[in-house]
Amino acid sequence: MRTIDGMKTITKIATQKRAGRYSIELDNQFAFGVAESVLIKYGLAKGRTLDEDLITQIKYDDAIAKALTIALNYLGHALRTTKQIKQKMRDKAVDEDIQAQVIAQLTQLGYVDDQNYANHYVATKKLITPKGPHVIRLALQQAGVAENMIEQALATYTFDEQCRIATKIAEKLAQGYQRESTRLRQQKMV
């Protein structure tokens, strides 16, 4: 049921096994799958005709929707940096231009904020798993946080807090060396 000028007609829209995904048949042949958001955005319905340019745009928008789903699922477990999200999308074979659009969209929505990540990371490491500023700096650098953001986050880590945490760690180590001689204990502590 082809129409004029290379236009194709949607002959069937069916749900896929994965929730929120739909199969589109053009001229009684499977053409592509789309996310529900793309289906709604383009008003895809049985009987609608599509040209090649529109089909290409629909497929591109669907690729963005897939990448956004990957990123949101990854973000659902914990705060993430831009670098971590890009790496996750790269692992799932998402194109660079689509990655950039997804990151821009997530940043605009406030879901990705490297400064916020750094601040929360420092606060968590101070309270839950006591770590010094050097270890925290290395972890944040590995996560892809910019140096100025790391500096800003570590500025909240006061010298008194560092001393308190160092004392706590030293006391914990001392308990492990109680059976050792005093001289050996001091050597291991330094």
What are these regions (language model features)?
Residues 2-190:
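An alpha-helical, amphipathic repeat domain used for nucleic-acid recognition
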